[in-house]
Amino acid sequence: MRKDVRILLVGEPKVGKTSLIMSLVSEEFPDEVPPRAEEITIPADVTPERVPTHIVDYSEAEQSDEQLYQEITKANVICIVYSVNNKKSIEKVTSHWIPLINERTDKDSRVPLILVGNKSDLVEHSSMETILPIMNQYSEIETCVECSAKNLKNISELFYYAQKAVLHPTGPLYSPEEKEMKPSCIKALTRIFKISDLDNDGILNDNELNFFQRTCFNIPLAPQALEDVKNVVRKNMTDGVKDNGLTLKGFLFLHTLFIQRGRHETTWTVLRRFGYDDDLELTQEYLFPLFKIPPDCTTELNHNAYLFLQSVFDKHDKDRDCALSPDELKDLFKVFPYMPWGPDVNNTVCTNEQGWITYQGYLSQWTLTTYLDVQRCLEYLGYLGYSIIQEQESQAAAITVTRNKRIDLQKKQTQRSVFRCNVLGARGCGKSGFLQAFLGRNLVRQKRIREDHKSYYAISTTYVYGQEKYLLLHEVLPDVEFLSEADLACDVVCLVYDISNPRSFEYCAKVYKKHFMDSKTPCVIIAAKSDLHEARQYYSLSPLDFCRKHKLHPPQLFTCNTTEAPSKDLYTKLTTMAMYPHMTQADLKNSTFWLRASVGATVFAVLGFAMYKALLKQR
């Protein structure tokens, strides 16, 4: 909403523009009226809308045309004043003033106009019969007011309507010609309805209506008031109320009624509470709240954010199969202006046999977005109405900023839940297969993935000492010389080589020696395609001898050419190394250590899924 309002009064000489301003300020008719009143500012605390208001007078005798044009450009609303007892001044409204104003303003952003019939004390009849056709002809005219500066009739109302025309304009909401709401308004209110429909049954029940009422107006509706609202809808349409709740059609009808009855402020209050600006676009302040991330820190969703996202999933998982079908996913994202997840997401997270994103995959994708692009995560949470449903100041309340990694190293412990593993290796060595295996896909399933749907990320959960952690794998394109800082910034590194290709290991050795030999980032050598015949590597040292020389863990055998889903043990090891980068190689080689780290991983995974299924049944 605007921080102030600038009102300009124009019209023919002697129609009473200056008298109107002076009567408002002094609350009495002036004995002497100057040719033009100085600009006055009404403080916010004495205006109904609590917004500072500047009132500007125009005098043809004292100002040039250029000065008039400048004032028209600066004005938020223009009052065209005519005298109800002067037919010529009424004619000038359409023959001179409206065309002049429209010439000086953009067609797509017309300044709202108020027609003001002054000197109503001098006539017994109304000018409305003459004015109404003009109002119907020009959609930029918000309203018409008849008043009298002499007896103070409708003076304060005039300036209130002028304020209202700026702060709660009709133009973006409603088409007088069509007598219906504009598409952009319907779209915004439909999103608001879907967010407020907490159980996604297409109806706002009494609890949801009361939550909506408290959210927008800070007061609940009494039971009788709720019934009165629904009765108004019932009397005007057959499908506005269903199962004693308000349907989308009924919700839209109510707002149409508010607008038609001059209660624009009601609809605008709702729109602004849900983040919309005067052009019915979500504001940048709403979508992207101020959020700073110190160096060497990462971003994660907190517990309340996960609970919210779980409720969104549950709301749209209609068949309760713990996965989102394409239709369910499309329905979930109807509150977005675009589809945020492409087909690559299905190859980034866990899916079921039908290729649908599972409950775990859904949470994983949100975790990935938060980690890699927190601003986009804030935007997405804004579309879902996080701050409104969770009653928070902004989406920033959903994000936890982890402490500096150097502090974690010093203290030899971390509170982080998301760890990044960059996967490097020569072209064709099996990096993509390594990522997809983490999602439970063997070689047969991987061959079904289209090249244009490929993802360079994979994220899922692992369990270390009974704690659920997210491991984010990122496949880095092969380029020894020009690896970027982003390619090197991670918690653990996987150097993958193809044991059947004699030239594959050389790339891993070069990357390690150039970029990681002197770093504190843990590294693991992965001997991929271990189901194939092992070829001797064309390098001065064998992979095993290379690892011994550089005090690395021996090469880890890996294959995704299995009948069942590939084992996740290796990924648990990677997560553990990322969590405990200070551990010595002797510790990491200790089989008892790995046993303790991975114990219960399968049990915890199964238990977590079973608990979610049980919760669904309870609901």
UniProtKB/Swiss-Prot annotation:
Binding site for Ca(2+) 1: D197, D199, D201, E208
GO MF term list: calcium ion binding; GTP binding; GTPase activity
Domain Miro: residue ranges: 2-168, 416-580
Binding-site positions, GTP 2: R427, C429, G430, K431, S432, G433, K447, K529, D531, T559, C560
Statement: the UniProt record of this protein carries the keyword Nucleotide-binding: yes
Keywords: Calcium, GTP-binding, Hydrolase, Magnesium, Membrane, Metal-binding, Mitochondrion, Mitochondrion outer membrane, Nucleotide-binding, Repeat, Transmembrane, Transmembrane helix
Membrane topology: Single-pass type IV membrane protein
Residue ranges of every copy of the EF-hand domain listed in the record: 184-219, 304-339
One annotated Gene Ontology cellular component of this protein: mitochondrial outer membrane
Biological process (GO), any one: mitochondrial outer membrane permeabilization
InterPro entries tied to this protein: EF-hand-dom_pair, EF_Hand_1_Ca_BS, EF_hand_assoc_1, EF_hand_assoc_2, EF_hand_dom, Miro, Miro-EF-hand_domain, MIRO_dom
Subcellular location, record wording: Mitochondrion outer membrane
PROSITE patterns registered for this protein in UniProt: EF_HAND_1, EF_HAND_2, MIRO
Record carries keyword Magnesium: yes
Record: residues binding Mg(2+) 1: T18, P35, D57
SUBUNIT field: Homodimer.
Similarity comment: family membership: Belongs to the mitochondrial Rho GTPase family.
Protein name, as recorded: Mitochondrial Rho GTPase 1-A
Organism (species): Danio rerio
